[in-house]
Amino acid sequence: MKKLLRIAVPLSLLASAASAQGSAPTAGEVIARIRDRAGVEARNPTVDTFKAGDSAARVRGIAVTMMATLDVLKRAVERGDNLVITHEPTFYSHRDTLGVLESENDEVLAVKKKYISDHKLVIWRFHDTPHAMKPDMIRAGIIHALDWDSRIRNGDAEVFDIPRTTVRALAAQLAGRLGARAVRISGDPLAVVRSAVLTEGFPGFAANRHAIQRGSPDVVIIGEDHEWETIEYVADAISAGQIDGMIVLGHIASEQAGMAEFARWLRPVVPGVRVDFVPTRDPFTFSR
């Protein structure tokens, strides 16, 4: 009888687990819920598509991240998550185009694809949708992380009137709030600033320039840009005495809080499914 009892308990647990797994939504169903709740028209074409795995797979857990690096994928697997929702590309280009890398048998790509396949991961990109939401979910997350909601000037969510500080002190505050390890400064670090323009990610020179023109800021804060475009433009503005400084956060640090915001937003959309925010580590640090 003891042997029968020892067998009966694990079988019962297995049956319960199988039942729970069978009732879990598929990856495709999760994404459909996200699209429905977001309530924005899908861009055509869009990069918000499945990048790997089977959309019919039952979801055990969701890992939300800024960028699905191999490090992030490993941490997702450790948590038991099999659906990864990433803001940025998985395979090194905006549209995750694999043609050249596969034709050249790229070894880095091969390792990543094998890991994804071995662990039956499903990867979906969430980029165009959050930026199309009103307000932009990624920007809103950053503003919340900085506690700048009340600092927005005249409803322009890229222009802020901030407490009096210096460029250096502001850079340190941003690094602490956003988890950036290698913030860069241009201009006089001790310059006193009271207004800022903030553009996350990589919106490009035209968008950055227009924000600067609208805001006439003391300091410009960006994620990243080509050094011969926004960087040079702001350097010239500093030399001309029009701007006091610039802070470059890095792309990941400048948008990561937006995906943390998305993870919070997602939990009530998929009740009963674990949603983990798995931050992407800042790839840079300073050499001392």
Regions found by a protein language model. Give the residues of each.
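Nuclease and nuclease-like effector domains acting on nucleic acids or nucleotide cofactors
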Residues: 1, 16, 20
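Bacterial N-terminal signal peptides that target proteins for export
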Residues: 1-8
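Bacterial N-terminal signal peptides
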Residues: 8-16
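Active-site catalytic microenvironments in core metabolic enzymes, especially phosphate/sugar-handling
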Residues: 21-288
